[in-house]
């Protein structure tokens, strides 16, 4: 690099530094996000993928029975009741061995309102998209807006076709339908679970939770068993 080029680079860096220095915190965050959001998102996705690879290598001796995300929920108890519900209660219900795990992430918070999108929101959406595209996710429990968003893109299985007759007959009035924006087909993308004891037993607070099975899930049988478990069937 020539001295001129080196000086130009230093000048550019100093100019950026001065711009940020003279901005308010709000304007500074907006500027960084507006001009650097692509590398920021790329870095987040790369870190998540690297973490997933290391996690897969570390846990390759374990078999995953089910992977579930619970979106936009708030714990109302200091005790980890979610782990008790899934890793103890549901595990016992399935009769799993110690070599089989249940993955549940209830930390994600996402929004589809463009006016409220932040770098954190983009990062969470990128993480969720990576889970779905890699076929690692089986079940999503979320509010109506999230189920609508992914359901309109064909993100869920039709529960009318997946549920066994004995289960369908008992929960058919709780099915939640969404119309695919491309095909125009309306299917039962999820099942309402707000009328069960799910929120009470998990210690979570969320509005009208709906459970959907991801369309490319590789463990649909276990996902259906989760519906049985939630409804006490």
For each predicted feature, which ranges?
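N-terminal targeting leaders characterized by basic, low-complexity, disordered sequences
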Residues: 1-10
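Short, membrane-interfacial amphipathic segments enriched in basic
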Residues: 14-26
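Hydrophobic membrane-insertion alpha-helices, especially the h-region
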Residues: 35-57
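Short, well-ordered beta-strand elements
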Residues: 64-74, 102-105
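Extracytoplasmic/periplasmic/luminal assembly and interaction segments
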Residues: 81-137
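Extracytoplasmic "Venus flytrap"/periplasmic binding protein-like
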Residues: 117, 123-182
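A bilobed periplasmic-binding-protein/Venus flytrap-type ligand-binding module shared by bacterial periplasmic
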Residues: 206-218
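Short amphipathic alpha-helical coupling segments at ligand-binding clamshell hinges
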Residues: 218-229
């Amino acid at each position: 690099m020539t001295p001129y080029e080196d000086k130009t680079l230093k000048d550019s860096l100093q100019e950026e530094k001065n711009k940020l220095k003279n901005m308010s915190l709000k304007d500074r965050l907006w500027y960084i996000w507006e001009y650097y959001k692509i590398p920021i998102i790329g870095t987040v996705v790369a870190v998540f993928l690297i973490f997933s690879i290391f996690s897969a290598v570390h846990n390759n001796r374990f078999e995953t029975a089910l992977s579930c995300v619970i979106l936009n929920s708030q714990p109302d108890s200091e005790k980890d009741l979610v782990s008790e519900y899934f890793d103890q209660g549901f595990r016992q219900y399935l009769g799993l061995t110690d070599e089989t795990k249940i993955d549940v992430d209830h930390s994600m918070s996402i929004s589809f309102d463009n006016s409220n999108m932040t770098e954190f929101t983009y990062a969470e959406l990128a993480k969720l998209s990576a889970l779905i595209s890699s076929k690692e996710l089986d079940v999503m429990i979320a509010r109506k807006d999230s189920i609508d968003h992914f359901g309109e893109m064909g993100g869920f299985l039709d529960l009318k076709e997946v549920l066994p007759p004995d289960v369908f007959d008992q929960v058919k009035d709780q099915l939640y339908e969404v119309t695919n924006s491309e095909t125009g087909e309306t299917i039962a993308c999820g099942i309402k679970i707000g009328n069960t004891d799910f929120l009470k037993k998990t210690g979570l607070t969320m509005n009208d939770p709906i459970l959907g099975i991801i369309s490319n899930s590789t463990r649909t049988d276990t996902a259906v068993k989760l519906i049985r478990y939630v409804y006490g069937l």
